[in-house]
């Protein structure tokens, strides 16, 4: 059963007919009144063409969505049973009718030389008093320069200067025998030297500085450098840079070695995926108060993670940058432009996101079909399995659907480390004969690369990280915003999914052994962060729509709303805001502090 426009434009009908292809199926085809008659000559099966009565022609998904958003009755537009299902599960709230097309960001990292005129102009803006001396120092040291540019005009927003050193070059570059000896004793391999971070003062200074630091650090990690040191160029030092480096885990070297240097061990970094902004629906996701709350929460979590393994690198990876670079690689692999063409020109491959990345979006000029997978825990957290996301077809059927497109698949995910999702999908892909052209991920670890070689897949990551100590996905730490699904026979109403966040008071942290006080502090940080973000969302929602953002309407603000599982006998009041429940959880968590001392009032 299809519309006449599908027969006219869908690529499956434009392919040559073959055994078991869609051309041999019997068809019921609906044609709108007044539409140009379509050519059904490609269909060898029986064709029955129908047109709808005029009163039904007025019914459209657009009208239904508008009525749902306005909380109006839709019984005259849709079957009452379907209406009840839509309202019970809070479907279509603030949802676009069509999947949004993923767009490339306008940020670009460009290496350049110290004599580049763009660098000189930037230094005069960010350090006007010492610009010339800095240029002279860069000329003497020969450090590499990385520019952060914006837009087609490549406006320079910031720059980082660095040098990758072997042990025999430490003294010649650092100019201090004590500092060279300190690095040689602690590095255990090649060393990255950060000599400068130049970003003009602005509200975005910290964000742009973080992007530059991440780019330089991941560049060094990909080359298997094991240690990093910050020693500013002569005559250049800035307090905000030291604060940014502190959030990456850098610590001061002993005072007898150097008064200005900071250092960090990069052998087993702690990875933090900065993705909360991708879980919030527009227009709330771009509201200044929400953006500020998300940014403040991220920096607070970064600070907290530096206490887990003092002196080890805490690497923050921006989901926005990963999206941008994955888009470039997907379209390049598919041989199509990065910007949607008109008319659309599809490449030969199909993009298949199989994790939490790129859900509900379309890659430009590329057939995009998401494999809806979910990590589902047993109620006691004793085990979990990779299954189909609730209300979606079983994984076997989803894979067969992918195979039916008869296109080589580009599998996409945010991370490939232990590979639990791809291990679950691999037998299904092989059983159906689905061709996997490439596996593209946000970051690929050494363990993940070994797994892909053993399975015979060609895998590539935006970032390559040989080792990691721990990895955190920020959204999964935030109650009501993210988490992992809990298996329950009955789901809560309001479109909420029972879930668990692996922090107190919902569960014991799953990360490598933490002392009780650190585990408690990390948990408090995460729950308070979620509360602050939800408060900002509730305030902005009230301002924009003149009503409260309650649990029953949380799906208007959060793409995949979840609720912390409290057991089968506990139910949420859907008329309350999510932040009020987190206030209660924070109070409960404060009762659980280890070694808490009572005070007399």
Short names for language-model regions:
Residues 102-136, 140-141, 145-151, 155-157:
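Short amphipathic alpha-helix that is part of the acyltransferase structural core
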Residues 175-179, 191-199, 204-222, 418-427:
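Conserved acetyl-CoA-binding loop-helix of GNAT-fold acetyltransferases
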Residues 155-157, 161-196:
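Conserved acyl-donor/pantetheine-binding loop and adjacent beta-alpha core of acyl/acetyltransferases
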Residues 191-194, 220-234, 437-438:
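Conserved GNAT acetyl-CoA-binding A-motif
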Residues 1-107:
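Classical nucleotidyltransferase
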Residues 9-10, 34-40, 235-241, 358-363, ...:
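Short, charged/polar "capping" segments at the starts of alpha-helices
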Residues 246, 252-601:
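PRPP-associated nucleotide enzymes
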Residues 199-201, 228-242:
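Conserved beta-strand-loop-alpha-helix junction that forms the acyl-donor binding cleft
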């Amino acid at each position: 059963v299809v519309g006449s426009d599908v027969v006219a434009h869908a690529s499956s009908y434009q392919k040559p007919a073959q055994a078991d292809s869609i051309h041999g199926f019997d068809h019921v085809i609906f044609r709108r009144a007044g539409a140009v008659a379509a050519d059904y000559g490609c269909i060898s099966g029986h064709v029955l063409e129908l047109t709808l009565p005029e009163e039904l022609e007025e019914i459209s998904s657009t009208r239904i969505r508008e009525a749902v958003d306005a909380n109006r009755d839709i019984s005259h537009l849709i079957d009452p049973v379907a209406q009840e299902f839509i309202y019970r599960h809070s479907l279509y709230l603030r949802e676009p009718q069509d999947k949004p097309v993923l767009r490339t960001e306008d940020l670009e990292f460009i290496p350049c030389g110290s004599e580049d005129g763009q660098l000189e102009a930037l230094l005069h803006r960010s350090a006007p008093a010492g610009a010339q001396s800095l240029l002279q120092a860069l000329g003497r040291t020969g450090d590499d320069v990385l520019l952060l540019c914006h837009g087609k005009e490549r406006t320079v927003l910031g720059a980082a200067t660095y040098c990758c050193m072997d042990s025999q070059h430490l003294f010649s570059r650092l100019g201090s025998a004590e500092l060279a000896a300190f690095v040689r004793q602690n590095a255990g391999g090649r060393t990255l030297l950060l000599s400068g971070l130049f970003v003009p003062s602005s509200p975005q200074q910290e964000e742009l500085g973080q992007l530059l630091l991440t780019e330089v650090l991941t560049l060094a990690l990909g080359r298997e450098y094991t240690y990093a040191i910050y020693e500013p160029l002569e005559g250049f030092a800035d307090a905000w840079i030291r604060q940014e480096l502190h959030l990456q885990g850098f610590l001061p070297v002993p005072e007898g070695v150097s008064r200005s240097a900071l250092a960090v061990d990069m052998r087993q970094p702690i990875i933090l995926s900065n993705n909360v902004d991708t879980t919030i629906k527009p227009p709330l996701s771009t509201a200044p108060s929400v953006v500020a709350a998300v940014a403040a929460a991220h920096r607070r979590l970064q600070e907290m993670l530096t206490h887990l393994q003092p002196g080890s690198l805490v690497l923050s990876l921006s989901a926005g940058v990963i999206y941008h670079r994955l888009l470039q690689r997907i379209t390049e692999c598919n041989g199509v432009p990065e910007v949607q063409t008109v008319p659309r020109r599809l490449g030969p491959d199909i993009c298949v996101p199989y994790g939490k990345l790129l859900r509900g979006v379309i890659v430009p000029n590329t057939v995009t079909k998401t494999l809806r997978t979910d990590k589902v825990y047993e109620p006691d957290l004793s085990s979990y399995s990779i299954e189909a996301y609730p209300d979606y077809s079983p994984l076997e059927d989803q894979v067969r659907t992918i195979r039916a497109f008869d296109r080589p698949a580009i599998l996409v995910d945010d991370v490939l480390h232990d590979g639990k999702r791809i291990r679950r999908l691999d037998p299904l892909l092989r059983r159906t004969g689905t061709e996997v052209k490439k596996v593209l991920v946000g970051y690929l670890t050494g363990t993940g690369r070994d797994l892909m070689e053993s399975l015979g897949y060609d895998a590539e990551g935006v970032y390559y990280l040989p080792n990691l100590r721990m990895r955190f996905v920020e959204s999964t730490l935030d109650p009501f915003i993210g988490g992992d699904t809990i298996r329950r026979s009955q789901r809560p109403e309001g479109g909420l999914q029972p879930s668990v966040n692996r922090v107190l008071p919902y569960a014991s942290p799953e990360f490598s052994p933490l002392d009780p006080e650190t585990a408690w502090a990390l948990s408090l940080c995460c729950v308070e962060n979620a509360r602050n973000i939800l408060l900002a969302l509730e305030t902005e929602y009230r301002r924009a729509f003149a009503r409260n953002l309650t649990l029953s309407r949380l799906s208007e603000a959060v793409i995949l709303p979840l609720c912390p599982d409290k057991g089968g006998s506990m139910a949420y009041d859907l008329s309350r805001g999510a932040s009020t429940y987190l206030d209660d959880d924070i109070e409960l968590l404060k009762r659980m502090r280890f070694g808490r001392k009572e005070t007399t009032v």
